């Protein structure tokens, strides 16, 4: 299942410091806002310097719908036609890629402690909301885009080892 995600997994991985917090920005989870207020940026191997990374996790349904809408808006595409391509496995994009995929991406460079935070906690790190979508067209969920993300919601505010989290759900990915 992970093979078709390789193009996304092979992009630069970025972690930022915002004040005293180190955060892994995920697309459609406040990443533009976090990047705009970042004091320091770590890329790929520099991420090993980090300790205790916060990761904002958004409600999977809300994020999938917002991400697909954002992608269609940016590319001037019809949402229903685009949804079909995603459903058929012919289209992937970081805006609606599962959040667990983003954790795998981080895991390439970081094996330490993480704290999953709710999307509501974004205001703790920044007051700016960049790229907030206004108009959203509802679409049906695609199970393999949200299944593990719903399980991640059970770990909000838990401090855990990223490796432990990855191992816990790796069988679901197979």
Regions found by a protein language model. Give the residues of each.
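Extended, structured, electrostatic nucleic-acid-contact surfaces
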Residues: 13-25
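PAPS-dependent sulfotransferase catalytic domain
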Residues: 6-14, 44-57, 61-164, 168, ...
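Extended, non-globular or repeat-rich regions with surface exposure
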Residues: 1-5
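Short, solvent-exposed loop/edge-beta patches enriched in aromatic
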Residues: 27-31, 42, 49
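Catalytic nucleophile-elbow at a beta strand-turn-alpha helix junction centered on a G-D-S/GDSL motif
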Residues: 25-37, 58-62
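Hydrophobic residues on the short alpha-helix immediately C-terminal to a glycine-rich phosphate/catalytic loop
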Residues: 37-38, 156
């Amino acid at each position: 299942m992970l093979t078709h995600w390789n193009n996304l997994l092979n992009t630069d991985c970025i972690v930022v410091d915002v004040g005293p917090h180190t955060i892994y920005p995920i697309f459609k989870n406040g990443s533009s806002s976090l990047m705009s207020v970042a004091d320091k940026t770590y890329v790929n191997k520099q991420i090993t310097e980090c300790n205790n990374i916060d990761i904002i996790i958004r409600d999977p349904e809300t994020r999938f719908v917002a991400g697909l809408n954002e992608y269609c808006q940016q590319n001037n595409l019809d949402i229903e036609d685009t949804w079909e391509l995603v459903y058929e496995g012919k289209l992937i994009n970081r805006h609606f890629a599962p959040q667990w995929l983003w954790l795998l991406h981080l895991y390439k460079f970081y094996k330490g402690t993480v704290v999953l935070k709710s999307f509501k906690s974004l205001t703790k790190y920044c007051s700016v909301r960049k790229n907030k979508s206004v108009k959203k067209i509802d679409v049906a969920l695609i199970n393999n885009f949200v299944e593990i993300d719903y399980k991640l919601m059970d770990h909000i505010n838990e401090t855990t080892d990223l490796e432990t989290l990855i191992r816990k759900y790796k069988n679901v990915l197979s």
